[in-house]
Amino acid sequence: MRLAVICFCLFGIASSLPVKVTDSGSSEEKLYSLHPDPIATWLVPDPSQKQNLLAPQNAVSSEEKDDFKQETLPSNSNESHDHMDDDDDDDDDDGDHAESEDSVDSDESDESHHSDESDETVTASTQADTFTPIVPTVDVPNGRGDSLAYGLRSKSRSFQVSDEQYPDATDEDLTSHMKSGESKESLDVIPVAQLLSMPSDQDNNGKGSHESSQLDEPSLETHRLEHSKESQESADQSDVIDSQASSKASLEHQSHKFHSHKDKLVLDPKSKEDDRYLKFRISHELESSSSEVN
């Protein structure tokens, strides 16, 4: 309730305040309403003054057209315009002098624009004549980690003997030359590899010799792998044979026990139930052992 009362009070105060009427008229209309007589005379132009102002402009425009038809260069036309402007300035009043200068300045600006466009076309043509050729780049394997090996491989692949260098050479000569070049390259590569693979300590020497032997003789590794596979196969076969022999021995031993026990049962006819139980047990053991062997 308090808020509602406060809002109504504010609305009442706002409505009681005086409202100013906005004046939508322009500044000229305001001045005219305040001072009607002098401003009306200033705003309404005199027709005689208009004719005096337009006459020199028409004369200058006609003379400019004639000069433009007769002369082609912009510099001469500018000079003629300057002379004509001087004559007009001597004849006209101060107001006419200012307006004629404005018209001449506008004409000179137009001509300067035309001259600038002509200069731009000339410079564009000269720039178009000069054309720089595009030079292709060549990929060089510099900065690579395997630059030495990469360069040697590229040399060995791109080594070709042309007929122009050796016109009288035969195929045999070319092949011998190729072989000699490859042998030279291999001889050059061997000391570099030796220097790179040379360690500082004796342990490193042993490891380096072992690695070099592995690299030089890859057949040893394959032979070792084959030998290890053969040894594993032979061990597996021997284990199978041993298991079979042991199973056979156990079966024989159990059968021997069974026969001996059977003989005892024949001698002792009172223990028939025990014999049945033993037979069932022995048969079960035999079946389990046979299943294990299989």
From Swiss-Prot:
Residues 85-110 have a biased composition (Acidic residues). One of its GO terms (molecular function) is extracellular matrix binding. It comes from Mus musculus. SMART domains: OSTEO (SM00017). The modification Phosphothreonine is found at residues 170, 175, 222. It holds the Pfam family Osteopontin. Residues 42-274 are annotated as: Disordered. Keywords: Biomineralization, Cell adhesion, Cytokine, Glycoprotein, Phosphoprotein, Proteoglycan, Secreted, Sialic acid, Signal. Residues 1-16 form the signal peptide. It comes from the Eukaryota. A motif (Cell attachment site) lies at residues 144-146. Major non-collagenous bone protein that binds tightly to hydroxyapatite. Appears to form an integral part of the mineralized matrix. Probably important to cell-matrix interaction. Acts as a cytokine involved in enhancing production of interferon-gamma and interleukin-12 and reducing production of interleukin-10 and is essential in the pathway that leads to type I immunity. This is Osteopontin. PANTHER family: OSTEOPONTIN (PTHR10607:SF1). Residues 174-187, 220-232, 263-274 have a biased composition (Basic and acidic residues). Glycans are attached at residues 123, 132, 137, 219, 288. Extensively phosphorylated by FAM20C in the extracellular medium at multiple sites within the S-x-E/pS motif. The phosphorylated form inhibits hydroxyapatite crystallization. Dephosphorylation via a mechanism involving ALPL/TNAP promotes hydroxyapatite crystallization.
